[in-house]
Design a protein with these regions (language model features):
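Non-catalytic cap/lid and distal C-terminal segments of serine-dependent acyl enzymes
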Residues: 1-178
């Protein structure tokens, strides 16, 4: 809680830190390990982390090569109770992707991404997140951007028990079995 502008400014500082400092440093360290460790980063998260992961990927597909997002909320209005400004908009994928121009250069990067996965259950505590996942899917599809959207059963709740199963499933799908 608290005033909206300082909270969203902190969110934007975090996003800038991850994109401008943390990720470049991680890539630099990987390059030092040799050619087998080069490339882009796959971002992922569950719950609030899913929202962050999708936001990072959609804002910076030049840095991130995809996302695995489990049970995410992809619009910022829940956190800002009707407040909207440039920074809230910039951190609300459903809002900014609705206005995404057809000729934007990121569109090609989204198409080249290894994986763009959004998953949500239909069980307890997933209702609003399921609506958000389907809303973002529909917005993206209308822009000819095609995420993998996997909706799990009505027994799948917003809980670590399920996210652990989903991580194993999607990491094997993305990276292959160990």
């Amino acid at each position: 809680d608290g005033p909206a502008r300082p909270r969203i400014e902190m969110q934007e500082r975090w996003c800038n830190y991850v994109c401008e400092e943390l990720t470049p440093r991680a890539l630099e360290i990987n390059r030092e390990q040799g050619p087998d460790h080069m490339g882009k980063v796959l971002v992922g998260g569950a719950s609030m982390g899913a929202g962050h992961a999708v936001n990072l990927f959609l804002r910076r597909p030049d840095l991130y090569n995809g996302t695995i997002a489990l049970s995410g909320l992809y619009q910022a209005d829940m956190f800002f109770k009707g407040y909207m400004d440039d920074l809230v908009y910039r951190n609300s994928p459903c809002d900014y992707m609705r206005n995404f121009p057809d000729n934007h250069p990121y569109k090609e990067l989204y198409a080249k991404a290894d994986k763009f996965i959004m998953c949500c259950g239909q069980g307890q505590w997933e209702e609003e997140l399921l609506r958000s996942t389907l809303q973002l899917r529909d917005i993206l599809e209308s822009k000819d951007i095609h995420p993998i959207v996997d909706i799990w059963g009505q027994d799948v709740s917003h809980d670590w028990y399920w996210w652990e199963k989903q991580w194993v499933y999607f990491l094997e799908m993305t990276l292959g079995k160990a």
